[in-house]
Each structure stands twice: as C-alpha cells, then as structure tokens.
C-alpha cells in the first residue's frame, strides 16, 4: 500500500513539473514527461480512450474501463499539471519579467541535457537519422521565428487554440505556451487562469481534450511503428527551440498584446559580453551558468530516479 502511495505521489510531482514547464513559452511539458520516464505510459493511457471502451464497459463495467485507461495514473498526473498551472502561473510569469536571464538559463540547460537524454534512446544511429534530426530542428526553429498572429479571444478561437496547444504540449520540444503566443492567445488564456474565468477555461479545456484524444493516437502509432525515426525528429524539435530560449537577447521591435502590454516582437541573440555592452546591464553569466548546470543535474537525477 505504501509503495502504491509513493508511486502516485511521484506521478503527481511529475505532473507538477510538467505543468510548470507548460507555463513557460519555449518549454514543453512533454519534455518533462520523457525525461521522467512516463511518456510512453501517458500516450498509451490516453490512446486507450476511444470507442472500443464500450466493449470493455459491457464486459467489465465502469471499474474495468477505469483500469483499462490507467485512470488513477491519468487523474494523478493531470491533477499535478492543473495544480501547477493554477498555482505557478503568476509566479513564473513574474519571474520571467523580473529575473529573465536566470530563469531562461535554467530552462536552456534543461532542454540541452534533454536532447542528450533523448539521443541516448535511439537504438540505430544511422545517417538517415541525422537527416530527421536536422528536419526536426529546422521545423522547430521555423516556428519560433514566425510572426505572431492577433486572434480575438472568441469562444471558437479559444476552443481551437486549446486543441492546437495541447498537441504541442505532449510533443517534447514544442511548447504549447509558445504556440499560444504565436496565435495571440497566450495572454487571454493565462489571464483566464489568473482570474479564474470559468467560461474561457472550460472551453479551452474542451479544446485540449479534443486535441489530446486525437493526436495521442497518431503519436503513439508513430512511436510503435517508427520509434527511432520519431524520437530523432522529436529531438530535432528540441534542438530547434534552443535559440528561442537563449537567455541573452536584444529586442529589435515591440508589439502590443491583447492585454495592452508592450512585449518583444523581434529579438536577436547576444553573447553575455555583447549584452552588457549594448544594454549596460549585468549579464549575470555566472548565475546563469550555475542554473544551467543545476538543470543538467536535475535531469540526470530524474533519469536515475526513473530507472529505479
């Protein structure tokens, strides 16, 4: 009994970590799921939510359905994710504004070591795999340099954005939050979380459920049939997002978001020393390095924990 309790506590904590990552534009909760060893279990559990459940229900009842979809695992994990988003949204948003370099440095280190972690999962290292890695990196980088849209937060747009964002959230390397930024829905959705706008939240979650149930089947099938190729492409996605979360940037132009706030539109990456010269602000390179290494240590620790 104690062992089961610890397992569910562990799953809940992994959900908290996934939720925290999903709040940050440029970081994916799917990455956290992968490095903590629950990615395949998550996809398979979601994939089992389909019309075939009717047969399970007729044969085994509701209890059988709950067991078939690994219900306790899903409830515990998503409980952690939603708890994290609800409680950490304000804190992470504040930290990204007030302490951007240390926070982005931590996530840069997290993604960098996660790339190494995922490359280790690839069994057959061929030249063709390298091509898929490059393709994934180009695709992800292309997304990061797209000009953001300015969609109005209508109910239908909120529904569609939920479906799109959740697909990104379960992909290691593609950030659901960043996709929301690209389509101009990040501020409205985060604002709804902060102020608990029930109508917006319910519509967004409905979109998430629709997207999750449909996309998980595709991704699960790809991982079963073409695991190495899929993992290589997903690793490329993570590589392609690294320039986006590089800590030192110069803002070239600004835009006004749907909340009336000035936010960066075009940015270019700088070295820490260029940053100090151009902005006359400290680069905090030593603190940044420490936090990058802390992220590396965290992932290696999670990897060891997942192997137990």
UniProtKB/Swiss-Prot annotation:
Main location: membrane
Keyword Transcription: no
Places the protein is found: Cell inner membrane
Biological process annotations from GO: cell wall organization
Keyword hit for Cell membrane: yes
Regulation: Active in alkaline conditions.
InterPro entries named among the record's database cross-references: VCA0040-like
Membrane-protein topology: Multi-pass membrane protein
GO cellular component, one term: plasma membrane
Pfam families in the record: VCA0040-like
Record key words, sorted: Cell inner membrane, Cell membrane, Cell wall biogenesis/degradation, Membrane, Transmembrane, Transmembrane helix, Transport
Knockout-associated phenotype: Mutant lacking this gene exhibits growth and cell shape defects at pH above 8, but not at pH values of up to 7. The mutant has less peptidoglycan than the wild type, and modest cross-linking defects with concurrent accumulation of the peptidoglycan precursor UDP-N-acetylmuramyl pentapeptide (UDP-M5). UndP recycling is impaired and mutant shows increased cell surface UndP levels. The mutant exhibits severe colonization defects in an infant rabbit model.
Record-annotated membrane-spanning stretches: 15-35, 69-89, 91-111, 130-150, 163-183, 200-220, 228-248, 282-302
Miscellaneous comment in the UniProt entry for this protein: Is sufficient for resistance to a surface UndP-targeting antibiotic.
Function: Flippase that catalyzes the transport of undecaprenyl phosphate (UndP) across the cytoplasmic membrane, from the external side to the cytoplasmic side. Is involved in UndP recycling during peptidoglycan synthesis. Required for cell shape maintenance at alkaline pH and peptidoglycan maintenance. Required by the cholera pathogen for growth and cell shape maintenance in the intestine.
Family: Belongs to the PopT family.
Full protein name: Polyprenyl-phosphate transporter
Native organism: Vibrio cholerae serotype O1 (strain ATCC 39315 / El Tor Inaba N16961)
Taxonomic classification: Bacteria, Pseudomonadati, Pseudomonadota, Gammaproteobacteria, Vibrionales
